[in-house]
């Protein structure tokens, strides 16, 4: 195994621990310089979970605490000369999930207590907003420096109940009450930084704080969290080479695979490509390219959102929306798109400046396969989808160019779930095929679109390419004819591989595949 060059901070989100432990730190302090030069005072940042928000918040805390020694060699070291020590109040709300009103009030109490021990508690300060107000004022009076307030994951207490009006309202009132002093505390505040997954106006809990700079979709801040291609290919290049050596890949091949799995996030109109930092760090540390981010937990609010809007798995990607669609309250939402985007399951792939519309797609292979696996049981159960079942068997037979055996396996599978699929529409069968072929993409390259036409599925193997066309109550011969007439094979002639055309017909009365036709060019 090739020697790893950097120490990666897996699971570490505290800036001081990373710097003192000599872990790799991707320098983001130039963004703090930008805040200070522009005299920004109230900043809001929305990013998906596990995307580096907490680390950036911790970096800000260390900076405003004047911990100069931690920033040696970083961009801000050349900018900052004074290193003033400000009182910093850092509230982490990520632990306030699945709470009722009493539990949330208790959690806020625990967040406030350490600062009351430092700066005292005034008589008559009982409610969280009164206590926050008093802490900030006393911190300023006792230190002579304005306070800094950092609120990390501000929306965590609300996301799981975002579609439950009776539960959302009391929790939202508590959080509105907690944040309410911030505007009138302006004379005592040096800087305020708030992070979350949703945009603040969506949960309408900052109604009084109308001077927030929402930088979430600004081009210049697109890589404030996450890892850019430049950062990856400079600071992490030696470990990409080492990973490639372990996986019998060249540097270029390894970089391409990392890109396919973890890149592709765009947070603005002209955003540079951004890699998921959680998955990238896990992959380089574990020396294996695998799905990590989706496996770290699918939020319950996402599943509830998909269920509420009856989202079909085929309808998730390549959606077009207005910029205003990202900025609606939960009560007014008409689709799952805003939460899918802000949660990191979809990202911006195109922007039409004439129409001011965005096209959203899955950012990368990791997210797409993870999402499909999560939703597959709704369509494909009771058969499990692992290497030993349908997808694995199907791929093994295609790998051996045993197309006949692969089709026999697929027919048997569809027959096994025929009762589940009885009286369903053509679209339901298309969904089943869509899931099966896209789940193959977890192991092999699967393509749907070409410049010439759109085959139902194209599966690449080391020595062969398989082009599938599916018909519903038609004929396999008709499917083969469409492959020929539309020229679906043309893009693959130059590959020098064996080329197979497979026409498949599904019979709605039999509720399984009735016939198929295989032709090799």
For each of these PLM feature ranges, what is it?
Residues 491, 497-521:
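Domain-level recognition of nuclease-like catalytic cores that cleave nucleotide substrates
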Residues 1-425, 440:
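Phosphate-binding site recognition
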Residues 178-185, 338-346, 434-439, 483-502:
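Metal-dependent nuclease catalytic cores in nucleic-acid-processing enzymes
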Residues 148, 464-466, 500:
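Structural motif
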Residues 169-173, 472-489:
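Mg2+/Mn2+-dependent nuclease catalytic core
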Residues 433, 455-472, 486:
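Conserved catalytic cores of phosphodiester-cleaving nucleases, focusing on short active-site segments
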Residues 138-143, 436-462:
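Active-site metal-binding core of divalent-cation-utilizing nuclease and nuclease-like domains
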